[in-house]
Amino acid sequence: MSHYPASGTWQACPKCGRHVHQRQWGTYQQCPYCHYWQRLTTAQRLEQLVDEGSFQPLTMTERPVNQLGFPDYMNKLRRAQRQTGLNEAVVCGTALIEQQPCILAVMDSHFMMGTLNTAVTRRLLHASEQARAQRLPLIIVTASGGARMQEGVYALVGMNLILAELARLAATPLPLITVLTDPTMGGVSASFAFKGDLIIAEAGAKIGFAGARVIQQTLPVKLPADFQTADQLFKNGMVDAVVERPQLRSTLGQALVNYGIGRSAHG
């Protein structure tokens, strides 16, 4: 195993273990040796997806609350906020992608694994409500380990609240596009990740419910090598397309053109 750190000037690739200089990862954060894709921060994802200067955050005041009195939860939250510069695991706003307007929500797995809680739920609800109010397509980029255990049933209720709001969105002509990135697991994959009119999986993404290790500890089965991969889901008809990271922006832009909602609603 490499002695190189997980971050810094030189970094060990999590997949192949080779030593990669930060410049070698490139704009799209891909290992030059094994082509492993690094997980992106929200800032990196926005930089790659939206037209320069077009992203305008929605006004959101929701903050996480320790309703269950879970030990050390608030300390973990503050630590995640310091490390990421975010106040929660999703950022939502209006944006242009290839000059096409949309409402965009981007989850960040660096913030407590992008887990779904009451604050993230309210932000996603607000994003969908704004899509309906402004008559814009909604794009959700998922990157999550599932529901946040520190908020227990309150986090699980969020799954149904989001599904109910997306049902209201589905009753309009407005499209929902979901982009499943690594990881998309647990309660997020079990709820809204697969509700898109168009479901795109980023190449190399791990997508599923329970992890492979948990499944193998529970059931005496040998899982296939491509288990819970974007390619496997595409092969089985669970996603509409698998797209390499450098092509995501143009793919989304073309999809928005094809739907023709944003420009027709906004001139």
Swiss-Prot record:
GO terms for molecular function: acetyl-CoA carboxylase activity; ATP binding; carboxyl- or carbamoyltransferase activity; zinc ion binding. GO terms for cellular component: acetyl-CoA carboxylase complex. Residues 9-267 form the CoA carboxyltransferase N-terminal domain. Its EC number is 2.1.3.15. Its cofactor is Zn(2+). Pathway: Lipid metabolism; malonyl-CoA biosynthesis; malonyl-CoA from acetyl-CoA: step 1/1. A zinc finger (C4-type) spans 13-34. One of its GO terms (biological process) is malonyl-CoA biosynthetic process. Its main location: cytoplasm. It is found in: Cytoplasm. It catalyses: N(6)-carboxybiotinyl-L-lysyl-[protein] + acetyl-CoA = N(6)-biotinyl-L-lysyl-[protein] + malonyl-CoA. It comes from the Bacteria. InterPro entries: AcCoA_carboxyl_beta, Acetyl_CoA_COase_Trfase_b_su, ClpP/crotonase-like_dom_sf, COA_CT_N. Keywords: ATP-binding, Cytoplasm, Fatty acid biosynthesis, Fatty acid metabolism, Lipid biosynthesis, Lipid metabolism, Metal-binding, Nucleotide-binding, Transferase, Zinc, Zinc-finger. It is an enzyme of class 2 (transferase). Pfam families: Carboxyl_trans. Disulfide bonds: none annotated. Zn(2+) binds at C13, C16, C31, C34. Binds 1 zinc ion per subunit. The keyword Zinc applies. HAMAP family: AcetylCoA_CT_beta (MF_01395). PANTHER family: ACETYL-COENZYME A CARBOXYLASE CARBOXYL TRANSFERASE SUBUNIT BETA, CHLOROPLASTIC. Component of the acetyl coenzyme A carboxylase (ACC) complex. Biotin carboxylase (BC) catalyzes the carboxylation of biotin on its carrier protein (BCCP) and then the CO(2) group is transferred by the transcarboxylase to acetyl-CoA to form malonyl-CoA. Acetyl-CoA carboxylase is a heterohexamer composed of biotin carboxyl carrier protein (AccB), biotin carboxylase (AccC) and two subunits each of ACCase subunit alpha (AccA) and ACCase subunit beta (AccD). Belongs to the AccD/PCCB family. This is Acetyl-coenzyme A carboxylase carboxyl transferase subunit beta 1.
